[in-house]
Amino acid sequence: MISNFDCTDNQASSKVLRPPGGGSSDIFGSEMPQTPRNVKNRMASNIFAAEKDNGVKNNVRQGAHRFYFIGDAPRRGQKTVDSHNRLFGEPTRPITPGKNHMKSSIPFGQNTEAVASAQKLLTTNGHYNGKSGSVSSASSSVSSSTENLKMNSGSRSVFRNMSTGPAVKETSLPESLCPPSPVRIEPPTPPADALSIDNSCRDSEIGDVPADNSTYTKSDQVNEACQTRRDSGNNPEQPHSLDKMAGVANIKEPLGLCPNDVKEGAQACSKLDSRNPITGLGLNGDGVGGLKPKKLKIREGNPVTGEGYKAGGNDYNQRQESSNAGTPVINKNRIPPGGYSSGLW
């Protein structure tokens, strides 16, 4: 039991008690909704039962569920109502008949129009939904192709009968109508340019020939000497004959020296005696400085024994000769190999 020692039993409580399920709960004796519930008897069969009263339905929603549906709305487990059907009603859809796949739609030896109409009635059942036209068009195309084959075969047979009959036969085209290919005629080759000396001599009457014309022996008959080149020596009248040629020039007499053979006189070099003030060696005419001056080397004497060298300015370094143990005396007037710091002497 709950006991409250701070407050007396006669004092009223300031707290308002509410049922746990809310104000609509029937724990504290609240009123129940007067709408009847639909009780489903799942064990009883309702095949032959009468339809229920459509007016007696529970359309009242409890709590927040009352805002979900307005009016007669299906419950869970039932088919939802499409908004398009609710606004515009049930759409009218044409019934598409099934195709008979066991029956062939290609006619052979029948009237094409009647078969096409019958096939259209069979396949479409009087309705057209835009799909059965392909079958009818295919059958019509096949039937038209068969009809064309029949017509072509019939026309061919008629043509054969007419050609084999006693009618007037068409004359075959003669082969002479096609002109033969013309024979190729090669153009004549033009003759090459012939010189006057190649032409044969011919006689023609031209009248009297002057006496000073010695080139002609007969009338209009050219001498062979006239038909040769102008430098021929047989024709004295030609200006370029061998008789009128100038004498051969004396080719042994030189006309003049070629410029390559002309040599200029040697000039005396004035810089041979010039010397370099730093090294004291001559420049040998090279005053420009492009070539290094040659260093004079004295190669007299034996560098090992010191024999053959001339006495120079370092004679004061020469010591007295001594013959210790018969060793030869080495001339000290030269620089030992490697310098004085080598320690050889």
From Swiss-Prot:
Judging by the UniProt lineage, the source's domain of life is Eukaryota
Mostly located where? Answer: nucleus
Short name of any one Pfam family annotated for the protein: JUPITER
**Bias kind Low complexity: ranges:** 132-145
- In this UniProt entry, the residues modified to Phosphoserine are 24, 105, 134, 145
Molecular function terms, GO-annotated: microtubule binding; structural constituent of cytoskeleton
| Composition skew (Polar residues), residue ranges | 1-14, 146-164, 212-226, 315-326
**Compartment(s) where it occurs, according to its Swiss-Prot or TrEMBL record:** Nucleus; Cytoplasm; Cytoplasm, Cytoskeleton; Cytoplasm, Cytoskeleton, Spindle
Work out whether the entry's keyword set contains Repeat: no
Query: In this chain, where does the modification Phosphothreonine occur?
Result: 35, 92, 96
Q: Pro residues bias located where?
A: 177-191
Q: Where is the composition biased (Basic and acidic residues)?
A: 78-87
Similarity comment text for this entry: Belongs to the MAP Jupiter family.
Q: What is the name of the protein in this document?
A: Microtubule-associated protein Jupiter
Q: What is the species listed in this Swiss-Prot or TrEMBL entry?
A: Drosophila erecta
